[in-house]
Structures are given as structure tokens and as C-alpha cells.
């Protein structure tokens, strides 16, 4: 058995599969079961009671995590003129249009989030088939198509994340790093949970949040009590 699998097995044995953990308990356990070799990302997966094939049940949105993600998010902005200057001043990592499109077509996608001003969307459409499957296509619904690039860049850099349910009805998101205090992880989780619950489609029947799991990179999944609302740090 490899050292990695031994470490995973030891970590997995700390998780009681017969129970559901409160968010703060899951956050503490995620930190405890995380790799000690690097600062792992803490992820959460929601299994939702929706049918993503139906347009009115495609749960997607954005939320600003109160403590950010702990990740250095690289932002690309499709803009020209004054908007391009504003994006640069706000801290965007890559700004441009034609040169950015050319780089994308060459396979150089060195960013985590793409933002575009409305007047550039016709041009951005030329790389939609590249950006779309990667979840990088700017979209008005996520606030990434906007004339206010200063605010958009600041929001993303400050911890605003986008989420979307996938074809298997799972919704994945990052809520921080293993180095975060457990309370901060729980509060980030709570902000995400509240927004997902708020977005429950009226046509979705039965249990909405069927299953929630928190884990770190390469760490075991920790089942979370989906009935816990508010008081996430208790």
C-alpha cells in the first residue's frame, strides 16, 4: 500500500459514516483529515433534487464568500478603451479583446474567471466553444457581463464565486483552504448554503438538498447534515 493510500485510509477512519455532521464539525474534521503536505482546498458538493434537463430547474448563481476562497484568482477581462484601463486599475490579470481571443484559440487559457463588457460579447462569442465547456464563458446571470468592470473584478478577487448544478444534479463549489479557521469555513459554507436554498426552483418536488459532502483535496468525504440552517458555527 502506498504512503498516499495509507494516509487516506487513516484519514477516512476518522469519519463516522453512520452520522451526519453539523457544518462546524465537518469543517473541523476536514482540517483534521487534510494532507499535511500542502494547503488543500476545501470543497463542498450538494446533491440536489432537481432535473437539470429542465430549464426551470437549472440551479446556478453567484455568492460572495465572507472569507474568500483563499485562492489567488486570475481574472481576464474582455474590454477596450476606458473599460480596459478601469479593469487594469481594479487588478485584472489579463485585459484585452483580439489578443486575448487569439491566445485562447491557441490554447493559452491562463485565467480562472472571464469578465466582459456588453459591447465585447459579439467578439467573445468567437471563443464560446472553448470557454463554455470550461465554465469560463462570461454570462450576465453570474455578473460577468457588465459595464462596471471595476466592481466585477473586485467582487471576484474578493471571494465571489459562481456555481451551477451539473448533469448529474451535483453542485460543486470551493469554500476555502484547510488553513482557514473552522469557523471561517463554516461561515463560507453557510453563505453558499443559504444562496442555494434561496434558489430552489418552485417546480422542484421532494427533498431539495438530498446530500451534502465536504472534503479537502484528496481527503475523505464528510457527510453534512443538510437540515442545519443558520448558526453554522455552532
UniProtKB/Swiss-Prot annotation:
One of its GO terms (molecular function) is tRNA binding. Binds directly to 23S rRNA. The L1 stalk is quite mobile in the ribosome, and is involved in E site tRNA release. It holds the Pfam family Ribosomal_L1. It comes from Corynebacterium aurimucosum (strain ATCC 700975 / DSM 44827 / CIP 107346 / CN-1). It comes from the Bacteria. InterPro entries: Ribosom_uL1_bac-type (IPR005878), Ribosomal_uL1 (IPR002143), Ribosomal_uL1-like (IPR023674), Ribosomal_uL1/biogenesis (IPR028364), Ribosomal_uL1_3-a/b-sand (IPR016095), Ribosomal_uL1_CS (IPR023673). Part of the 50S ribosomal subunit. PROSITE patterns: RIBOSOMAL_L1. NCBIfam families: rplA_bact (TIGR01169). GO terms for biological process: regulation of translation; translation. This is Large ribosomal subunit protein uL1. GO terms for cellular component: large ribosomal subunit. Keywords: Repressor, Ribonucleoprotein, Ribosomal protein, RNA-binding, rRNA-binding, Translation regulation, tRNA-binding.
Amino acid at each position: 500500500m502506498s504512503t498516499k493510500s495509507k494516509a487516506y485510509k487513516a484519514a477516512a477512519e476518522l469519519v463516522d459514516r453512520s452520522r451526519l455532521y453539523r457544518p462546524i464539525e465537518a469543517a473541523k474534521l476536514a482540517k483534521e483529515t487534510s494532507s499535511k503536505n500542502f494547503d488543500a482546498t476545501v470543497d463542498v458538493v450538494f446533491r440536489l433534487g432537481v432535473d437539470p434537463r429542465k430549464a426551470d430547474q437549472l440551479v446556478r448563481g453567484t455568492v460572495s464568500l465572507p472569507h474568500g476562497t483563499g485562492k489567488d484568482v486570475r481574472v481576464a477581462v474582455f474590454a477596450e478603451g476606458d473599460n480596459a484601463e478601469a479593469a487594469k486599475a481594479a487588478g485584472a490579470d489579463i485585459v484585452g479583446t483580439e489578443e486575448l481571443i487569439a491566445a485562447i484559440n491557441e490554447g493559452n487559457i491562463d485565467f480562472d474567471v472571464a469578465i466582459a463588457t456588453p459591447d465585447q460579447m459579439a467578439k467573445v462569442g468567437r471563443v464560446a466553444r472553448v470557454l463554455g465547456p470550461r465554465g469560463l464563458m462570461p454570462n450576465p446571470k453570474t455578473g460577468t457581463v457588465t459595464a462596471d468592470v471595476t466592481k466585477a473584478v473586485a467582487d471576484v478577487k474578493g471571494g465571489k464565486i459562481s456555481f451551477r448544478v451539473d448533469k448529474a444534479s451535483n453542485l460543486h463549489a470551493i469554500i476555502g483552504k484547510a488553513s482557514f479557521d473552522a469557523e471561517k469555513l463554516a461561515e463560507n459554507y453557510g453563505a453558499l448554503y443559504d444562496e442555494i436554498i434561496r434558489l430552489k426552483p418552485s417546480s422542484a418536488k421532494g427533498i431539495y438538498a438530498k446530500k451534502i459532502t465536504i472534503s479537502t483535496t484528496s481527503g475523505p468525504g464528510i457527510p453534512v447534515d443538510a437540515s442545519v440552517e443558520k448558526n453554522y458555527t455552532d
